[in-house]
């Protein structure tokens, strides 16, 4: 699954992302693209048992790949 959150104002990117994560099964992957690094999202992901990878894009946006882990 992929979400493009560019151009959205907070808290909409985080709300969209959390809603998509609720539908994920263990091992599923979600890729989001945000205008800025979602620092508050990282805390939430760690608490809920997701791993993530952050990549800077050439256009200045950030791509975050989120994987739901067991536990």
Please state what every model-predicted region is.
Residues 49-71:
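C-terminal edge-of-domain segments
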């Amino acid at each position: 699954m992929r979400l493009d959150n560019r151009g959205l104002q907070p808290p909409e990117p985080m709300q969209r992302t959390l809603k998509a994560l609720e539908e994920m099964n263990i091992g599923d992957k979600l890729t989001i693209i945000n205008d800025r690094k979602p620092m508050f999202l990282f805390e939430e992901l760690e608490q809920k048992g997701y791993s993530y990878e952050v990549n800077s894009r050439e256009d200045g946006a950030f791509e975050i790949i989120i994987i739901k882990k067991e536990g």
